Amino acid sequence: MEEFQGYFELDRXRQHDFLYPLLFREYIYALAHDHGLNRSILFKNAGYDKKSSSIVVKRLITRMYQQNPLIFSANDSIQNPFFGHNKNLYSQIISEGFAVIVEIPFSLRLVSSLERKEIAKSHNLRSIHSIFPFLEDKFSHLDYVSDVLIPYHIHLEILVQTLRYWVKDASSLHLLRFFLHEYWNSLITPKKHIILFSKGNPRLFLFLYNSHICEYESIFLFLRNQSSHLRSTSSGIFFERIYFYVKIEHFAKVFFDNDFQCILWFFKDPFMHYVRYQGKSILASKDTPLLMNKWKYYLVTLWQYHFYAWFQPGRIDINQLCKYSLDFLGYRSSVRLNSSVVRSQMLENSFLINNAMKKFETIVPIIPLIGSLSKANFCNTLGHPISKPTRADSSDSDIIDRFLRICRNLSHYHSGSSKKKSLYRVKYILRLSCVKTLARKHKRTVRTFFKRLGSEFLEXFLTEEEVVLSLIFPRTYSTSRRLYRGQIWYLDITSINDLVNYE
């Protein structure tokens, strides 16, 4: 963000009014290129030319406002390499610059909010692992849970209207609306709906989707605060809105009866918790199924009448936490009852006390993980390691380093597992697959290669956690081993490995 501030040097209070002129500045596309925003789509293939980028954008916007936006002269294709490519490339040029521009007000507002609330180490909140300590702390005291699939068929006009509450630049919004209608078929699908979580989606459309989800969660947060004894304060930094409460009151008057406020305060729910991940959300509560059905009704009404998205009530299931497992973010999470029997003796009488305590457990689902390893040609569908085809010019050290990197990344991500047995099996598959790959390259047997590599090869597959803990506790080996076998959550994990993403 310091780089953004250095480039633009605009007053924060007026920054959202000057977005459209930035679209024709050279440094916008330099930022998009230098920060790696989809560089493989545009700049790596077509080449980046600072002197001609703004000229290209001006011509594209001019032709987009005309009847035939893709009529280019022969001189254009000769003078500029951009015009020698297809329509997708032209739309990518504008979307790249527009994505950088519209993110500026959001980013600066978030930074100022974090500074005002004096929240240190806010980057830790972005870690995927930061969700699980929250679940460990809260879910062991809850009873019911709903795993909700957030509707993703969103009309493009609703996306523009949602962004209008954040960006007050009419020219930028008009250009965005025209751009979406013009290039929608070439960028997404022939239908006017977004297909989410696809690697081919531009950054701009992911930004529009996230702003739409922010709109939904803002309303959901308002409803939650109105119906709860406990007011939520920690989420305020993520849901700053302009004219937010005015819109909420209008929403309540139109789609609910006059007793809406009374209904909210009648059903007090102090233990409603919400978690969102990968286009899904989790609702958990300590109260009865009646209150869970209340929130189910709220969500269905919210999506159908406010966002015009068809949402079937049957897609929201209400389950008991003690009988249900949640599969998300590469883990299988559940709440289990752990019984402990204590024998007590008082004078001549002795009796047994059976204590049942709830514990939140997270394990590695081995079957989906083996399926991912099978698709990546590390093993077959039964989990038996196989040799992986490699390039002829790959050295042995490169092959070993590649397998070690994959093994350590998986171990690092799954360090929070309650049980390590599945993780040990994954290590075994990767280790033996590495040996078979080397043996196949040198046309030797696996046994011969094991003897050649020796015990040092097995030690190389020690995870980063084991090495670090052994350095911290050099004289207490049992302590480091016990800590490693426990759950460790890291706050530096911001992305999911492709082998872990089963969705």
UniProtKB/Swiss-Prot annotation:
Keyword set includes Protein transport: no
InterPro entries (alphabetical): Domain_X, Maturase_MatK, Maturase_MatK_N
Protein's cellular compartments: Plastid, Chloroplast
Coiled coil: none
GO molecular function: RNA binding
GO cellular component, one term: chloroplast
Pfam assignment, any one: Intron_maturas2
Region forming the signal peptide: none
GO terms under biological process: mRNA processing; RNA splicing; tRNA processing
Keywords: Chloroplast, mRNA processing, Plastid, RNA-binding, tRNA processing
Function: Usually encoded in the trnK tRNA gene intron. Probably assists in splicing its own and other chloroplast group II introns.
HAMAP family: MatK
Family: Belongs to the intron maturase 2 family. MatK subfamily.
Protein name: Maturase K
